[in-house]
Curated annotation (Swiss-Prot):
It is a lipid-anchor. Residues 1-17 form the signal peptide. This is Lipoprotein MlpC. A lipid is attached at residue 18 (S-diacylglycerol cysteine).
Length: 148
């Protein structure tokens, strides 16, 4: 009987020891998971902190129409650094130029609208080779109202 009592006590001690280790293990696993999560967040933050290009920064400030006309303008400014030079201008001047482009393109309608828009794109391309954005509204004008 003494042997059975001793074995029973040893069994209870072992069982109690296993439970305490399991609780510690669970706590450690939870802490490691939290650390891993923090580490993952810091890695995600570093990948998201890439500097935005001038174009991306500008797009955040533009309306949908202005974004559309910026997309229209980009292939027109194909020369070396022309589009980047355009982006260096003041945001208000860029918005004004994009609104002017919208006005000019909206005035192109009728049978020859596509040809007139293509001609206007050429005018814009030539203007930005030599012109200053301050004179854009007067220097880059479509012929849509004249012949349309």
């Amino acid at each position: 009987m003494k042997i059975i009592n001793i074995l029973f006590c040893l069994f209870l001690l072992m069982l109690n020891g296993c439970n305490s280790n399991d609780n510690d293990t669970l706590k450690n696993n939870a802490q490691q998971t939290k650390r891993r999560g923090k580490r993952d967040l810091t890695q995600k933050e570093t990948t998201q902190e890439k500097p935005k290009s001038k174009e991306e920064l500008l797009r955040e400030k533009l309306s949908d129409d202005q974004k559309t006309h910026l997309d229209w303008l980009k292939p027109a400014l194909t020369g070396a650094g022309e589009f980047d030079k355009f982006l260096e201008n003041d945001d208000d001047k860029i918005k004004s130029a994009l609104d002017h482009i919208k006005t000019q393109l909206d005035s192109c309608n009728g049978d020859q609208a596509e040809q007139q828009k293509t001609t206007f794109k050429t005018v814009v391309t030539e203007f930005f080779k030599n012109g200053d954005i301050d004179n854009f509204a007067t220097g880059a004008v479509s012929n849509c109202n004249n012949g349309g």
